[in-house]
Amino acid sequence: MVIAAVTATSAGASLQPPAGYQQPPQHHAASRFTCPSFPAPFTGALDFTSKYEGSDSARATLNPQADHAFHEQTKAITELEKVVSQVVTGFARDGNPARADCVVNGLDAWARAGALTAVAKNHTGKSMRKWALATLSSSWLQLKFSPTHPLDRQQQKAADVEHWLSHLADLTVAEWRDLPLKRVNNHSYWAAWAIMATAIVTDRRDLFDQSLAMYRTAANQVDSEGFLPNELRRKQRAFSYHNYAIQPLVMIALFARSNGVEVTAENDNALQRLARRILSGFDNPDVFTRKTGIPQDSAFTQHASSIAWLEGWCALQTCDARTNQRISALRPLHSTRLGGDLSWLFAAH
């Protein structure tokens, strides 16, 4: 089990990711690689249609037309996330420095254009910024901390990319911190994860501390039964959104531990209560049906990307045989916005 490589126990120590981010590539092979085309930098205002447009306050019913518009409007951003994640995952497998060069050059173009830094005119725009940041920073970490030092080949461009990511993190902090508690939900947790990943990329302890503060707010929202009241409002998607909400929290806890901070005990072991509630739902979602009074959509439990967070969870603590069996049946578990191949990053080798 891979947990932490270096512990930063003092304020002066450099921030470090978990050990999986500092592994050498799985093997070194002279594999052929052609850098894919990167989408043109998105420099416009972050003003996107919500896929739940027209839904009631529960925001639980998809609007097919709005969903299509959302995907069209955000295509360049999501394509960037996909390309970066795939190329970095390939680098973790074969260590081909051309893959790192590909990512550096692609992101440098976005950085030089000031992409994703324009005003976010609505909630969906703010959401896309922090989701993209989560993907880019958690992928970049694997290049930055690789023992093969692939970023040394293009140091100035790498520095420019990191400066851009740092700026995106500042914008994300401004948009998601200090919200009224009734508005703090999974979106804030994902923002906190994006901020944490960028804190490690840039070695900025102010971002690290901000992410931990947001984590603690999240932990204090977990009730005595392991539910998140703001996610229970999502009606038939309450179970799904609990599963979605825990993902960034697990990652933050792992990164905090790698730097000498243990947050899992917050609010009487809130993260464990939340995880146990969700895991019980995997076996029988009726617990969420009874709580909300509405049958739950549980199709997501069959999708590997939706349970990829379990690799991280089982690095935080020992998982039981049932959970390990669930994970092993679907490996490798990949989540673009959590850093790519989480089986490689956290599971035993």
State where each predicted segment sits.
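Extended amphipathic alpha-helical interaction segments
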Residues: 161-192, 198-205, 213-222
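N-terminal signal peptide c-region/cleavage motif recognized by signal peptidases
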Residues: 6-11
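Sec-dependent signal peptide recognition
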Residues: 1-3
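Extracellular glycan-targeting catalytic surfaces
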Residues: 12-181, 189, 255-258, 263-349
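Catalytic-loop motifs flanking and including active-site residues across diverse enzymes
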Residues: 79, 132, 187, 191, ...
